[in-house]
Amino acid sequence: MHKLLKLLSITLIGLSVATGVQANVRAEMNQMKTVAATLTNAKDVAEFQESAKILREIAQQSSEKRPSSITNDADFKGYQEGMKEFITALDEADKLAQEGNLDAAKTAAKKLFDIRNVYHKKYK
C-alpha cells in the first residue's frame, strides 16, 4: 500500500509537470529533489524506472527555463550544460535499472546529488 501511494504521488508530480503547469524553476528543483530521493530508496526496478521517467521530464523542462539567479547568456548556457550532465547521469542509472541491476542503479543515482551540488554552487 505504501509503495502504491508513493508511486501515485510521483505520478501526480509528473502529470502536473507534463500538463504544462507553469512552475518556476525553484519549484521544479524542489520536485527534482523529492523525486531523486525516491530513486535511491526504490524498492524495485519498476519504482526506480517510474521515478527516473518523471525526474527526466522535470529536468528537461527545467533546463529550458532561466532561473532568476542567472542574468546572462553565458551563465544560462552553463546551467543548461549542468542540466544536460544531470540528465545523462540519470539515463545511465536508468539503463542499469533496465538491465535489472537495481543496486548499481541506485548507486549511480547518487551521482545526481553530486552534480546538483556542483551546479548549485555556481548558479543558485
Curated annotation (Swiss-Prot):
GO terms for cellular component: periplasmic space. GO terms for biological process: electron transport chain. It comes from the Bacteria. InterPro entries: Cyt_b562, Cyt_c/b562. Keywords: Signal. SUPFAM superfamilies: Cytochromes (SSF47175). GO terms for molecular function: electron transfer activity; heme binding; iron ion binding. Residues 1-23 form the signal peptide. Belongs to the cytochrome b562 family. This is Uncharacterized protein PM0670. It comes from Pasteurella multocida (strain Pm70).
